[in-house]
């Protein structure tokens, strides 16, 4: 796009990933990126390409996705939120919009990304949350899960928790927060890192579930991390329990937060 009169906008986006084959645009199946770009292009009256903070997989949800795009269109601020939402299905919504400096980049400007994984831990399944939570009927020992999770804090080689087809050049990531707690019949895993490998969060959760059902001995997560071998870890937890809840940026960008991020993610 020619630099003259180009504006850069950041948008906060939430979506129910149950209806899409992930974030990334694909040729045949529906994607969140495609739907958003279509809606933005209608408002701008020219083709819009967007960049996101984190490319979520099929079935993964978000209340904190951040995207940016560039445009030569001169529109009211509300056109990029209310206007765009009028062309989106009810399971995708723009929740805030802000004009940013041209050097802002949704992916590369991000400092950390935070995810929440929610498990419905009850003997009987839920009819309401089938596509929103992962149901585990066996009682989970949350204290054990949280204890083992602390071995993953800090900068490590997370080869044991990356997908076999992960294309990242380096397996090293820095986890700054990893908490496991129970709220009635819900078990929640909160995790924050500079960035994540493909399936990293779901592979960590899958391994912590094995700890929670007492299938593995104490310090297993520590040993697993040191092995650097995916084949020794637990199964990948289902996508439906995973939410991208917050992306942190330098304060000078002054980006808004989702209205209920502070409630949903502590």
From Swiss-Prot:
EC number: 5.4.99.12
InterPro entries the record matches: PsdUridine_synth_cat_dom_sf, PsdUridine_synth_TruA, PsdUridine_synth_TruA_a/b_dom, PsdUridine_synth_TruA_C, TruA/RsuA/RluB/E/F_N
Binding site residues for substrate: 115
CDD domains for the chain: PseudoU_synth_EcTruA (cd02570)
EC supergroup of this enzyme: isomerase
SUPFAM superfamilies assigned: Pseudouridine synthase
GO MF term list: RNA binding; tRNA pseudouridine(38-40) synthase activity
Keywords: Isomerase, tRNA processing
Pfam families, alphabetized: PseudoU_synth_1
Function as written in the Swiss-Prot or TrEMBL entry: Formation of pseudouridine at positions 38, 39 and 40 in the anticodon stem and loop of transfer RNAs.
Similarity field: Belongs to the tRNA pseudouridine synthase TruA family.
Subunit organization: Homodimer.
Name listed for the protein in its UniProt record: tRNA pseudouridine synthase A
Species of provenance: Buchnera aphidicola subsp. Acyrthosiphon pisum (strain Tuc7)
GN (gene name): truA
């Amino acid at each position: 796009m020619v630099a003259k009169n180009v504006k850069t906008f950041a948008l906060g986006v939430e979506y129910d990933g149950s209806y899409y084959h992930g974030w990334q645009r694909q040729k045949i199946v529906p994607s969140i990126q495609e739907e958003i770009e279509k809606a933005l292009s209608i408002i701008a009256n020219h083709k819009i390409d967007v960049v996101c903070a984190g490319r979520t997989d099929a079935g993964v949800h978000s209340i904190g996705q951040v995207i940016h795009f560039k445009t030569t269109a001169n529109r009211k601020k509300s056109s990029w939120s209310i206007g765009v939402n009028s062309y989106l299905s009810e399971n995708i919504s723009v929740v805030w919009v802000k004009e940013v400096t041209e050097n802002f980049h949704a992916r590369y400007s991000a400092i950390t990304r935070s995810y929440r994984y929610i498990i419905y831990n009850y003997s009987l399944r839920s009819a309401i949350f089938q596509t929103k939570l992962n149901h585990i009927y066996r009682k989970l020992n949350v204290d054990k899960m949280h204890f083992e999770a602390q071995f993953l804090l800090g900068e490590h080689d997370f080869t044991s928790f990356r997908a076999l087809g992960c294309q990242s050049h380096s397996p090293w990531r820095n986890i700054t927060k990893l908490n496991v707690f129970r709220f009635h019949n819900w078990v929640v895993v909160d995790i924050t890192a500079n960035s994540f490998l493909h399936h990293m969060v779901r592979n960590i959760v899958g391994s912590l579930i094995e700890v929670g059902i007492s299938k593995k001995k104490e310090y297993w997560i520590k040993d697993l991390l040191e092995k650097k071998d995916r084949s020794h870890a637990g199964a990948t937890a289902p996508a439906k329990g995973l939410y991208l809840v917050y992306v942190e940026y330098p304060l000078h960008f002054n980006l808004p937060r989702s209205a209920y991020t502070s409630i949903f993610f502590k």
